[in-house]
Amino acid sequence: MSLYVVISPTGRTDGNIPARGYAGPSGRLDVIARAYNAILEPNATLAALLMGGPLPPRLLIAPLSCKDIVRSERSFMIEASRALRGRRSCFTVNDEGVEALASLLRRFKPRILLAEKGGDISSHWGEMCSSSPTFIAGSHLDPPHGLIKHLERSLGGFLRVSVGPLSLHTDHVFLLVSALRLPMHATSIEHH
C-alpha cells in the first residue's frame, strides 16, 4: 500500500465549499481532487494537509477504495465537504493536522518528497517501487519550507526525487508515479 500526500497551504479546513465555482472558495481543493483522481494504484490512499483556515490545519484522508463513488472533481468536493463538516463520508478527517500527518508518515517508508530539485527518478527506482512508500508533493503552491523542515526533523528526513526537468502539476506527477508503479501491482496480482 502506498500513500500520496498533498500539502495545501490554502486548502479550506471547514468544508464550506460551494457546489459550483468551488476552485477559489475552497482554497484550491480542486487541485487535490485532480491529484486523487490521477492516482492509478488501487490500494493507495491520498492524505491532504489543509492549512488554509478558518480552522487550524486538518488532515483529510481519502482512500482510493472510494473511487467507485468519487469519480470526478465535483464528487470529490462533495465527499471532502461532508468529511470536513463531520458528516458521513467515505473520507475521514483528523483534526490534529501536522502531527496527524507526521504520525501517518511514520507508517510508510521510504518517504519521498517529489521536488523539482530532487535526484533523478531513474536513480531511485528501487525506492519508488518499494511496497509501502509515501509520495509527498505540494498543491498549486510549494509546501511551506518550515513545515517540510519540521517533518524532516521529526521523521529523519525525506528522499528528494524529481520526475524530470519540467514543472508539472501535482496530478500529473501522481499519475506518472502511480503509472510507473502499476507493473509492480500487475505482477503481484498475477501471482496470487
From Swiss-Prot:
<dbReference type="GO" id="GO:0005737">
    <property type="term" value="C:cytoplasm"/>
</dbReference>
<comment type="similarity">
    <text>Belongs to the methyltransferase superfamily. TrmY family.</text>
</comment>
<dbReference type="GO" id="GO:0030488">
    <property type="term" value="P:tRNA methylation"/>
</dbReference>
<dbReference type="InterPro" id="IPR029026">
    <property type="entry name" value="tRNA_m1G_MTases_N"/>
</dbReference>
<dbReference type="Pfam" id="PF04013">
    <property type="entry name" value="Methyltrn_RNA_2"/>
</dbReference>
<dbReference type="InterPro" id="IPR007158">
    <property type="entry name" value="TrmY"/>
</dbReference>
<keyword id="KW-0489">Methyltransferase</keyword>
<protein>
    <recommendedName>
        <fullName>tRNA (pseudouridine(54)-N(1))-methyltransferase</fullName>
        <ecNumber>2.1.1.257</ecNumber>
    </recommendedName>
</protein>
<keyword id="KW-0808">Transferase</keyword>
<comment type="subunit">
    <text>Homodimer.</text>
</comment>
<keyword id="KW-0949">S-adenosyl-L-methionine</keyword>
<feature type="binding site">
    <location>
        <position position="138"/>
    </location>
    <ligand>
        <name>S-adenosyl-L-methionine</name>
    </ligand>
</feature>
<feature type="binding site">
    <location>
        <position position="114"/>
    </location>
    <ligand>
        <name>S-adenosyl-L-methionine</name>
    </ligand>
</feature>
<dbReference type="GO" id="GO:0008757">
    <property type="term" value="F:S-adenosylmethionine-dependent methyltransferase activity"/>
</dbReference>
<dbReference type="GO" id="GO:0008175">
    <property type="term" value="F:tRNA methyltransferase activity"/>
</dbReference>
<comment type="function">
    <text>Specifically catalyzes the N1-methylation of pseudouridine at position 54 (Psi54) in tRNAs.</text>
</comment>
<keyword id="KW-0963">Cytoplasm</keyword>
<dbReference type="InterPro" id="IPR029028">
    <property type="entry name" value="Alpha/beta_knot_MTases"/>
</dbReference>
<keyword id="KW-0819">tRNA processing</keyword>
